[in-house]
């Protein structure tokens, strides 16, 4: 979640923070808007321990995304390296999203104060 800035900050402080955010904006090529979901499930064998009250099979890790049609399970990530790469890519996306949200809040406050957004 993006940090809410202090609206009592001076316009100069907001512009400095904006310049800093812009200098820190980095779009990682592996950014990924998705979730990594851990699932446990029952198999299709009626006499398996998972149907007799035992532990379910898993964990299985799925990459999921919310699209216009709903939440989609993209695919199963079997290798630990795939799972770690997905976690890192999702974190990169969240970092970018947080910085953009803070930048948007600063711009909204500058507009409210009737200041130009250009030239920062």
PLM-predicted stretches and their roles:
Residues 1-120:
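A positively charged, amphipathic N-terminal helix/segment that binds anionic biomolecules
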């Amino acid at each position: 979640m993006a940090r809410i800035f202090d609206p009592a900050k001076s316009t100069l402080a907001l512009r400095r923070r904006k310049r800093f955010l812009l200098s820190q904006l980095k779009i990682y090529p592996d950014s990924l808007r998705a979730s990594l979901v851990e699932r446990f499930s029952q198999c299709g064998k009626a006499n398996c321990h998972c149907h007799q009250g035992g532990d379910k099979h898993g964990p299985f890790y799925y990459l999921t995304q919310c699209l216009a049609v709903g939440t989609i399970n993209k695919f199963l990530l079997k290798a630990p390296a795939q799972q770690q790469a997905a976690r890192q890519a999702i974190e990169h996306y969240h970092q970018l999203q947080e910085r953009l949200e803070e930048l948007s809040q600063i711009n909204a406050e500058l507009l409210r104060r009737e200041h130009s957004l250009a030239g920062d």
